[in-house]
Curated annotation (Swiss-Prot):
Gene Ontology MF term list: rRNA binding; structural constituent of ribosome
General function of this protein: One of the primary rRNA binding proteins, it binds directly to 16S rRNA where it nucleates assembly of the body of the 30S subunit. With S5 and S12 plays an important role in translational accuracy.
NCBIfam families: PRK05327.1, rpsD_bact
Top-level taxonomy: Bacteria, Pseudomonadati, Spirochaetota, Spirochaetia, Spirochaetales
Biological processes annotated in GO: ribosomal small subunit biogenesis; translation
Domain of life: Bacteria
Designated name of the protein: Small ribosomal subunit protein uS4
Amino acid sequence: MNRKQIAKGKLVRRFGINIFEQPKYDKILKKKPHPPGMHGKARKAKITEYGKQLIEKQKIKFTYGVSERQLTNTFKEAKKHHGVTGDNLLSILERRIDNVVYRAGFAISRAHARQIVSHGIIILNGRRVTIPSIILRANDQIQIKEKDSLKKLIRSNIEKTSSLRNLPTWIEVNADDLNIKVKHAPSRDEIPTLANEQMVVEYYSKRA
């Protein structure tokens, strides 16, 4: 296991949930269900309200692979929209182009999806893009660069991930043409629950 895998293993143990949505981390949690540095039934230290909010914020940060600055800016953007700020926050993060590539099964992880976008493999609405943080909108369409080796890679990824995750209802995927279409912005019930987003809103609201 390399250093990055070890670090991710510690994160899922710290949070007590497989935020990376990959089977190998389920195995780690099953084998070592307690946080790093805590053994067996050792008594947990009491966590303050701020500590709880920080943990939930970190869950979202590491789940989507965003920086502190990116998450802060996403929160500010979420506040500008009508509706529940926490729901808006998750909806924006879900619509990042790297996350959509991941959700569609074109990449085996979000980190891998970021690489795919950064390397110019993705065509968005007919134009090549290289920025993983682009936020998609309804009717946006993603295609793969016309190159046989790239298409072979993406098809292999789809095959590997098809049994591991459910395709979101808010995107449409054509596995034959390797095309993704955003049908609409996801509502809260269309987004997997990996963190308490309301606590994240409280965390940032107190620091606004």
